[in-house]
């Protein structure tokens, strides 16, 4: 993982550790948004992985889609 990707993964790791147990595991997509973010950052680095993560988080809302949404290759 690149240094930028590692830095961008810190808020995701904090969310998983602190907030996720409180808000529950109710993501509309599979894999969950945090799992998607970690995979995108690991696979594509900080810039593209960060962009993919941002797009995914913006799609994850009550009126958004559902289903399987894997990280593109």
Swiss-Prot record:
Membrane-related topology note: Peripheral membrane protein
Membrane found in the keyword field: yes
InterPro entries named among the record's database cross-references: Membr_insert_effic_factor_YidD
Chief place of localization: membrane
Stored Pfam families: YidD
Location relative to the cell: Cell inner membrane
SMART domains per the UniProt record, alphabetical: Haemolytic (SM01234)
Keyword set, alphabetical order: Cell inner membrane, Cell membrane, Membrane
One cellular component (GO) term of this entry: plasma membrane
Protein role: Could be involved in insertion of integral membrane proteins into the membrane.
Similarity comment: Belongs to the UPF0161 family.
PANTHER family in the record: MEMBRANE PROTEIN INSERTION EFFICIENCY FACTOR-RELATED (PTHR33383:SF1)
Stated name of the protein: Putative membrane protein insertion efficiency factor
Taxonomic source organism: Dinoroseobacter shibae (strain DSM 16493 / NCIMB 14021 / DFL 12)
């Amino acid at each position: 993982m690149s240094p930028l990707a590692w830095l961008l993964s810190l808020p995701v790791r904090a969310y998983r550790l602190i907030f996720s147990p409180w808000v529950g595991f109710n993501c509309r997509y599979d894999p969950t948004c945090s799992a998607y973010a970690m995979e995108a950052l690991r696979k594509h680095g900080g810039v593209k992985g960060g962009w993919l993560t941002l797009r995914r988080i913006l799609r994850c809302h009550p009126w958004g889609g559902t289903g399987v949404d894997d990280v593109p290759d």
